[in-house]
Amino acid sequence: EPIESNFVRSEILRILIESKNIQNFIFNNYFFDALDIANKKETKSSNSTILFWEIIYFVAEGNFRGAKVSVSDIYLSLGVSKSTAIRCVAELEDLGILEKVRDSNDRRRAVITLTGKFRNEFVDFLDKMLHQLKNVVDSNAVR
């Protein structure tokens, strides 16, 4: 994939992270349902769902920028406890969204990445979203 595309995707993620209202509407009503992830969980706590998405965004943005994201990066950046981060990452692993791989430079460290299947679906979704945003911008420019 072109680096430019990953940069644009990471910028879209940054915007979504900063705009919680858009994030909650789009992802809770569209993307979660589209992947049937929410239905796999016995409890659909709003706080858990938001934290899951914050972790997914953080990992995805890091992956798109070529960064190696660890559990400690997650809990330090998102301001949650280490145990909460570990539990959420484990649940997201069980759902097939995240996976842990050993860091090639430091075998003691686990790097958190999006699974291939989820990454492909997420990239498709972000690309569709980018296309929709472009259409909105283009239609406003014509006026």
Residue ranges and their predicted role:
Residues 1-46:
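N-terminal leader segment of winged-helix/HTH proteins
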Residues 22-37, 53, 59-63, 136, ...:
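Linker/hinge segments immediately adjacent to helix-turn-helix/homeobox DNA-binding domains
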Residues 25-28, 47, 58, 65-66, ...:
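N-proximal short alpha-helices
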Residues 39-80:
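N-terminal helix-turn-helix DNA-binding core of bacterial DNA-binding proteins
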Residues 66-110:
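Canonical helix-turn-helix DNA-binding module
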Residues 103-126:
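Short, cationic-aromatic polyanion-contact patches
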Residues 123-143:
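Amphipathic alpha-helical dimerization/coiled-coil segments
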